[in-house]
Amino acid sequence: MTYKIKYLPLAVQDLNNIARYLSGFYPKTASRVLKELREKITKLGDTPKMCEVYHLDPAYRRMVVDQYLVFYLVNDEIKTVEVHRVLRGAWNLPQYLE
């Protein structure tokens, strides 16, 4: 069963910030990383529970893509994956998920 992928505004902002940052230093890397992030997130539509539950907040699931972490919620009732944040793994994550 296919789930709809919904990007929350903060997740869109995160992706735009990643693109802007990487484009300033590594233009080719920026397009590759964004393509990889979008492709992996799209796969959640077919297998939304393929990633682990985030240990600090079990409401979220966490997908690792290169050096980034995608935090999302699965709503089985309306068959939707809500992408909440896309963050660098090196950041202090709990403060970004509040």
Report residues per predicted region.
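Histidine-centered metal-chelating micro-motifs
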Residues: L69-V70
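Enriched for short, Lys/Arg-rich terminal
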Residues: L73-E98
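Basic, Lys/Arg-enriched alpha-helical interface segments
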Residues: M1-L56, Y60
